């Protein structure tokens, strides 16, 4: 059974509007899974509308920011699947988790 926090995150994400179609994420089933990994730590899986979507990184970042805006959420990990460049999308969306980059 999903936690109360993950349910609130789902409700928030379902209200986001897709930039390409102008329809809500909840209508499009873009978000495929939301789970609470630890207290305040949320993992969100999503599938872009197209395997070649140029907006996959932007969509992932919007999902992350929206999830972080929910009271009680301390950290968010976003995972993209179904995109031609899943690994790159995931790295770019979650790059701030690695901490600041050292200066050269």
Predicted features along the sequence, with ranges:
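Domain-level signature for proteins that mediate thiol-based redox and metal-cofactor handling
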Residues: 1-104
């Amino acid at each position: 059974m999903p936690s109360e926090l993950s349910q609130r995150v789902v409700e928030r994400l379902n209200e986001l509007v897709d930039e390409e179609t102008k329809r809500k994420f909840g209508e499009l089933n873009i978000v495929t899974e939301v789970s609470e990994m630890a207290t305040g730590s949320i993992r969100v899986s999503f599938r872009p509308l197209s395997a070649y979507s140029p907006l996959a990184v932007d969509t992932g970042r919007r999902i992350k920011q929206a999830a972080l805006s929910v009271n009680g959420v301390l950290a968010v990990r976003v995972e993209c699947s179904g995109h031609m460049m899943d690994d790159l999308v995931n790295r770019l969306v979650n790059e701030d988790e690695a901490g600041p980059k050292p200066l050269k």
